[in-house]
């Protein structure tokens, strides 16, 4: 028993930093862990049900191609933010069920994993574990985890990037046999788990770190080869998600503007609350909270830069990130020069994690050198700190923050500044490194208290106890399935409110999410379909009191036959007015036999060629086989009026079977497995070579 207790104590001491990070996570996200709270808004919206649908209707290696339940039907490959390819989602969906409570618990786990990754990364840049712990603690309170808690991709990107940067550190990537496969897997998950804008900023951040690492590395060739393998193999694996979209870019807009930037109105959130009535815009797109420690150390950092040029690198990265986060002519220039940066819709949230990482390392490197500064330098730093306080007071009053908010902010900053002074005094008086680490640990504890209090005052964006938020009308897990396949034909689609619609109404109606669970067929939904030509062309129609194409899509499964595609809207009108008498082509008869989620079966008899128009959404994923007397021919669908699915049918007596198949499915999986093999085989070869050389 005594040995067991001793072993437990030794383990606790050995991993005390990780235990502290776990404790912080449990305290902050205790209501996630209890299952009584989740992030609000989008977390329970499209992102929740898209991930539910991915594993309800398919699996990782056999993903669904088509979701018929919302927006008149949508292809899976178009939903770049669905999160189904994120492996932790697979684990939860398969073993725990993808309920809101479990999704929130997963998010808490991921944030813990991200902070542990940053701890490992910090140890490369600072001299001892306590400083690394300080970095990990600050990263645990990354604004991405709180202001953007509803956005799965933003959080997951911020979780994974520290791990990838950690794997890229020269000593680890060269000396650890598992570094390449682990790095490939992490980059693959970064590709599939991040929003596109976050992914691009993460790749640029990795590139910047690569040049930093290789500058100080003697074994540059060995290092560069290993990094190249990680990113090449990870990219090949990630194309399982992106290849169909990349080869269908013609369906998407090419010029994307930055619709969420860092401006004066939200710049105040670097220290003030981001959930406040005096601010404008989406509260989840505001926060750049830096924490009190960095702000108090700014004056000292100015002097430390003269002695530690490494800080200049981080300062440069801060300014680069800021440029990408704001809207300016310089930003537009960078977006026009740097490939793929122009796809960023939300510059502030896309580049904020890079900005935050830089801020943390400036903080750590400054703190590490703080005891080397002269007394005069520290006095000057305190005078500059007073100027910073005046600047913060001016911002608070000009933006109409309450007196209590301004007063509390000053108390936090002054208390932090006093703790820094006490640490400096301790570093002079205490010669024992262990004793000084205890003082630093107390500074860390004070910062933890301030961070927790700050985010508890800003819970609107990251904690809601209305787990189902009235979106479903009942709890997520109690909604019964109504539709069971196969059907003879598709039932009418459900439009919850009559047109006309304003843009926000047809783009952001959460209520349609329940149809993913019931299996019914919703007309609209809160999903990112606005960029696809087929869906974008419906927007003007939804803004009318009545439109033939919308009405046609709403009806139960229906076929119009025609000889050409002239006056299609008139034909649709006649079809709907004349009691669905729509097969007007003589000697052409169509009968539906079966309707399934991703397939349809018809019997077709015709003495002439004709066009078959379905009241279904067009997507290039849909193709068909026409079989007559065991001889089959494949045909592809094509769009009419940009949105409707049409087929050119030759004369004959056929069994017509249409099926949704994701484009380039064989090619993307072939590339995925080649990337996996590249990662594993290169690991074996390079480690054998390294062993021989050593």
Question: For the regions a protein language model found, what residue spans apply to each?
Answer:
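Membrane-interface helix-loop junctions at the exits of transmembrane helices
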Residues: 26-35, 58, 87, 92, ...
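Extracytoplasmic
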Residues: 405-410, 447-609, 613-620, 626-632
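Hydrophobic alpha-helical membrane-insertion signals
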Residues: 4, 8-78, 458-466, 471-512
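Contiguous transmembrane helix-bundle modules in multi-pass membrane proteins
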Residues: 159, 172-175, 180-185, 198, ...
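Active-site-proximal, structured, solvent-exposed surfaces of multi-pass membrane proteins
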Residues: 10, 323, 579-694
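Membrane-embedded helix bundles of polyisoprenyl
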Residues: 21, 112-124, 129-215, 226-246, ...
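Membrane-interface coil-to-helix junctions
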Residues: 24-115, 137-159, 249-250, 258-284, ...
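Alpha-helical transmembrane segments at the extracellular/periplasmic loop-to-helix junctions
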Residues: 79-87, 263-304, 310-311, 345-363, ...
């Amino acid at each position: 028993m005594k040995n067991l207790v001793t072993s437990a104590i030794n383990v606790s001491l050995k991993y005390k930093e990780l235990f502290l990070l776990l404790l912080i996570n449990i305290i902050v996200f205790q209501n996630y862990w209890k299952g009584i709270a989740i992030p609000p808004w989008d977390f329970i919206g499209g992102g929740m049900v898209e991930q539910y649908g991915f594993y309800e209707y398919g699996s990782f290696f056999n993903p669904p191609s088509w979701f018929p339940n919302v927006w008149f039907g949508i292809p899976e490959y178009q939903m770049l933010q669905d999160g189904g390819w994120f492996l932790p989602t697979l684990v939860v969906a398969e073993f725990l069920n993808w309920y809101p409570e479990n999704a929130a618990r997963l998010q808490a786990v991921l944030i813990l994993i991200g902070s542990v990754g940053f701890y490992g990364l910090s140890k490369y840049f600072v001299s001892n574990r306590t400083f690394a712990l300080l970095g990990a603690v600050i990263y645990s309170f990354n604004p991405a985890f709180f202001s953007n808690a509803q956005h799965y991709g933003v959080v997951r990107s911020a979780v994974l990037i520290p791990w990838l940067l950690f794997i890229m550190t020269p000593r680890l990537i060269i000396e650890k046999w598992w570094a390449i496969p682990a790095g490939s897997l992490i980059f693959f998950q970064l590709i599939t788990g991040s929003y596109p804008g976050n992914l691009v900023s993460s790749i640029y951040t990795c590139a910047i770190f690569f040049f930093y690492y290789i500058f100080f590395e003697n074994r540059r060739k060995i290092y560069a080869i290993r990094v190249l393998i990680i990113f090449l193999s990870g990219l090949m694996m990630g194309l399982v998600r992106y290849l169909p979209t990349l080869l269908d870019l013609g369906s998407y807009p090419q010029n994307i503007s930055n619709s969420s930037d860092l401006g004066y109105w939200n710049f105040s959130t670097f220290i003030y609350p981001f959930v406040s009535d005096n601010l404008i815009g989406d509260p989840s797109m505001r926060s750049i909270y830096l924490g009190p420690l960095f702000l108090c150390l700014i004056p000292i950092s100015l002097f430390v830069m003269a002695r530690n040029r490494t800080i200049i690198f981080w300062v440069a990265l801060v300014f680069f990130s800021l440029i990408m986060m704001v809207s300016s002519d310089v930003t537009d220039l960078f977006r026009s020069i740097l490939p793929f940066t122009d796809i960023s819709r939300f510059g502030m949230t896309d580049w904020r994690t890079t900005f935050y990482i830089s801020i943390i390392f400036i903080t750590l490197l400054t703190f590490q050198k703080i005891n080397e500064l002269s007394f005069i330098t520290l006095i000057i730093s305190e005078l500059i700190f007073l100027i910073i306080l005046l600047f913060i007071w001016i911002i608070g009053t000009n933006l109409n923050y309450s007196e209590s908010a301004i007063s509390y902010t000053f108390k936090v900053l002054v208390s932090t500044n006093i703790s820094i002074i006490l640490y400096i005094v301790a570093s002079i008086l205490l010669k024992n490194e262990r004793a000084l680490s205890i003082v630093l640990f107390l500074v860390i504890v004070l910062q933890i208290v301030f961070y927790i209090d700050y985010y508890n005052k800003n819970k609107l964006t990251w904690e809601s106890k209305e787990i189902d938020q009235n979106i479903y009308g009942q709890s997520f897990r109690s909604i019964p399935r109504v539709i069971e396949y196969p059907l003879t034909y598709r039932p009418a689609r459900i439009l919850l409110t009559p047109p006309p619609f304003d843009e926000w109404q047809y783009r952001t109606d959460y209520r349609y999410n329940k149809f993913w669970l019931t299996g019914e067929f919703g007309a609209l939904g809160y999903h990112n379909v606005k960029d696809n030509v087929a869906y974008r062309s419906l927007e003007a129609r939804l803004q009318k009191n009545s439109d033939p194409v919308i009405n046609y899509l709403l009806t139960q499964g229906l076929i119009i036959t025609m000889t050409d595609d002239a006056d299609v809207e008139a034909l649709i009108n006649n079809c709907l007015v004349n009691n669905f008498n729509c097969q007007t082509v003589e000697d052409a008869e169509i009968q539906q036999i079966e309707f399934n989620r991703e397939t349809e079966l018809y019997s077709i008899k015709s003495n002439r060629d004709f066009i078959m128009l379905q009241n279904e959404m067009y997507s290039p994923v849909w193709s068909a086989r026409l079989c007559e007397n065991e001889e089959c021919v494949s045909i592809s669908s094509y769009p009419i009026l940009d949105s409707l699915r049409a087929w050119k049918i030759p004369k004959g007596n056929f069994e017509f079977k249409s099926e949704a198949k994701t484009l380039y499915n064989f090619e993307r999986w072939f590339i995925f497995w080649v990337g996996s093999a590249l990662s594993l085989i290169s690991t074996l070869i390079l480690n054998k070579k390294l062993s021989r050389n050593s």
